Regions:
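Position-specific recognition of the canonical hydrophobic site in helix A of tetratricopeptide repeat
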Residues: 25, 59-60, 94, 128
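Residue-level detector of the short coil/turn that links helix A to helix B
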Residues: 28, 62-63, 97, 131
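Canonical tetratricopeptide repeat
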Residues: 19, 53, 88, 122, ...
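Structural marker of alpha-solenoid helical repeat scaffolds
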Residues: 5-9, 43, 78, 112, ...
Length: 169
């Protein structure tokens, strides 16, 4: 409520909208979250965390792939050693069907963030899709060792056992 009452000319800090956008997203209120992320980008168009969050959210929902890819490329340019941002770009490439291009990007993300289960899982999916089955299972086993979420653990175990069917584009 406080944020809604701030007058436009007094808003100088993008982080207010970014933070509220995350809260809205976690509450499954995507339309409101998206508006706040866009407002944060109006205030700070080159903010890599906002570029990443909004673009990854679009990709995750199957929306705005072309714009999301541009935003993620820019975010990686701004923060090339942020494994989470690099992963977002790699995952966007993967979701867009650019599997061969996605692999080295996801490999870089996994090098930067060795202990993140989701990044290792993404790399496993990409490896599987390009025919690198043994490497995929290795990445999934690593992801399994890092995950604490029972639903994710079951999904990863299934991939290790049965492989992975790439999603329709």
């Amino acid at each position: 409520k406080v944020i809604d009452n701030i007058e436009e000319e007094n808003v100088r800090d993008w982080i207010i909208y970014y933070t509220r956008g995350i809260v809205f997203d976690q509450e499954k209120r995507w339309a409101e979250a998206e508006m706040d992320f866009k407002k944060a980008l109006e205030i700070r168009p080159e903010q890599p965390m906002v570029l990443n969050y909004l673009a990854y959210s679009w990709v995750d929902r199957g929306l705005n792939y072309v714009e999301a890819k541009k935003m993620l490329i820019r975010a990686v340019e701004l923060r090339p050693n942020d494994g989470y941002i690099v992963d977002s770009l790699g995952w966007a490439l993967y979701k867009m069907g650019d599997y061969e291009e996605a692999v080295p990007v996801l490999e870089r993300a996994a090098q930067l963030e060795t202990q993140d289960w989701a990044i290792n899982d993404h790399l496993g999916d990409a490896y599987w899709t390009v025919g690198r089955k043994n490497e995929a299972r290795f990445q999934w086993r690593h992801a399994l060792s890092l995950s604490r979420d029972e639903d994710k653990i079951d999904l990863i175990k299934s991939k290790i056992k049965d492989g992975y069917t790439k999603p329709e584009i």
